[in-house]
Amino acid sequence: MVKVWFMDDEQETDQRLEHHRSPPDYLELPELYQKTGVEYFKINADDYQNDAILGELRAKRGYTYDDEITCSEKCLPDYANKLKNFFTEHLHTDEEIRLVLDGSGYFDVRDNEEQWLRIQVVKGDLIIIPAGIYHRFTLDSNNFIKARRYFVGEPVWTPHNRPADDLDCRKSYLKHQAESFVQLNQV
């Protein structure tokens, strides 16, 4: 099950560590959604092709393309540079949909007060990062994650590094954030 917490402000230590505040300050999933619009679903990773929740998500949201990515030093070409790029604060013009099939990692997202929230994802976690939110990704200390990526149509994975506040997706995101993300995409 996904865990979410406010991150400390430490930037000099390993990004793959948990980076809890002292004392730790956790969020529940409804609060994560209200602050960021990030959605979470529990999926049967061992039989994801037949998972009813995933099937419904794909049908309702038009996810017609998917692929698989494995992030580890052994499997990812140009590993160090890819991780550096993943951890650079950025946004996308489309949702970022990830289902963890194996391993673990962290998605960091900014809340409505510009604080970093760390989302720990493990096998069976599916998260949807909304278009227009500043975020980043890193592996944890296990240095391994295998995930399915879902897209509407042909895959477009273009990161727009911060600042990108002039993009329409960012303006739309901020409008929805101001409204505490009235749930439009219920499954």
UniProtKB/Swiss-Prot annotation:
The lineage of its organism: Eukaryota, Metazoa, Ecdysozoa, Arthropoda, Hexapoda. InterPro entries: ARD, ARD_euk, RmlC-like_jellyroll, RmlC_Cupin_sf. Keywords: Amino-acid biosynthesis, Cytoplasm, Dioxygenase, Iron, Metal-binding, Methionine biosynthesis, Nickel, Nucleus, Oxidoreductase. GO terms for cellular component: cytoplasm; nucleus. Binds either 1 Fe or Ni cation per monomer. Iron-binding promotes an acireductone dioxygenase reaction producing 2-keto-4-methylthiobutyrate, while nickel-binding promotes an acireductone dioxygenase reaction producing 3-(methylsulfanyl)propanoate. Its cofactor is Fe(2+); Ni(2+). The keyword Protein biosynthesis does not apply. Catalyzes 2 different reactions between oxygen and the acireductone 1,2-dihydroxy-3-keto-5-methylthiopentene (DHK-MTPene) depending upon the metal bound in the active site. Fe-containing acireductone dioxygenase (Fe-ARD) produces formate and 2-keto-4-methylthiobutyrate (KMTB), the alpha-ketoacid precursor of methionine in the methionine recycle pathway. Ni-containing acireductone dioxygenase (Ni-ARD) produces methylthiopropionate, carbon monoxide and formate, and does not lie on the methionine recycle pathway. Its EC number is 1.13.11.54, 1.13.11.53. It comes from Drosophila pseudoobscura pseudoobscura (Fruit fly). Coiled coil: none annotated. Ni(2+) binds at H90, H92, E96, H135. This is Acireductone dioxygenase. GO terms for biological process: L-methionine salvage from methylthioadenosine.
